[in-house]
Curated annotation (Swiss-Prot):
Superkingdom to which the source organism belongs: Eukaryota
Activity regulation comment: Activated by threonine and tyrosine phosphorylation.
UniProt-listed Pfam families: Pkinase (PF00069)
Designated name of the protein: Mitogen-activated protein kinase 1
Induction line: Induced by wounding in a cultivar-dependent manner, in cv. Pungchon but not in cv. Subicho; this induction is reduced upon UV-C treatment (at protein level).
Comment block on domains: The TXY motif contains the threonine and tyrosine residues whose phosphorylation activates the MAP kinases.
Amino acid sequence: MVDANMGAAGGQFPEFPNIVTHGGQYVQYDIFGNFFEITTKYRPPIMPIGRGAYGIVCSVFNAELNEMVAVKKIANAFDNYMDAKRTLREIKLLRHLDHENVIGLRDVIPPPLRREFSDVYIATELMDTDLHQIIRSNQGLSEDHCQYFMYQLLRGLKYIHSANVIHRDLKPSNLLLNANCDLKICDFGLARPNLENENMTEYVVTRWYRAPELLLNSSDYTEAIDVWSVGCIFMELMNRKPLFAGKDHVHQIRLLTELLGTPTESDLSFLRNEDAKRYIRQLPQHPRQQLAKVFPHVNSLAIELVDKMLTLNPTGRITVEEALAHPYLAKLHDAADEPVCPVPFSFDFEQQGIGEEQIKDMIYQEALVLNPEYA
């Protein structure tokens, strides 16, 4: 069991000021100065459980589903074009993906005014905590915990990759957990299609979990970047601290080469960028260290698996399917219970050069699919 204490002290939920709006169809709560307007199928207790640059997340009771859910308010969702596209992408992806180890979409709350809305409310399954919080805590984690977390992450990733999707932003805080140790992957705002050789734009994600091909600006990366991130997360789970906590781009590459060795010419064979190759060739030479000696307390089979995940050349990196079949996960692996996505996800909606109003309308349509009575 993972200890995940939530709610206010003593289990009592505070009552937040609220008013009924739009002819009784909506309730607007004042959550510590944040307006939170949701349909009347959402009822107290309502509790803020997180906040970020995007806005606020509250747990609230969904009377239709008869369960507590997490509702994320994305404030001023259309002020930034890229952020608006991310929101639409995440909604469409979550509606397409249906897997035990991927966070489940419960609702996109329809806005009261179709043309004049600026905030987007997305409801998902409610989880208790995330892997980042668990790693930072002083809670003991057994070998069984670590195996189970890794197995579920890879099981979910197999499904995601089979849908022709690369997550691109795997990190401990994007892996949600409940008290039963169930793990669900979330935050698909940066996800991309898996199209080899297609020029994919550079983007900013958490540097510590970024594969070498991304650090070297390779534009034709594959789902192997997610496997690298899993390797980094795996070691952080075992070691209770980040494996490559680079202060900046250059420092990140240095940390990689100090542990995993300076890339050889064959390691660099995937790179087309001559500037990147020249940069690597002038780096100080480091041999690849034996992970078993650097981390003597870590299970030898776990080290063997991580070693295959942290292969500098992505073409030689272990695949998710191969990782699931590795001896470290033998007691959990069951190919018959590791489903794939029956229909690949289509990113076609992004190819049309859609404008802000189109994005807004598409999000509204997504809300209507889930709430036809508001059409």
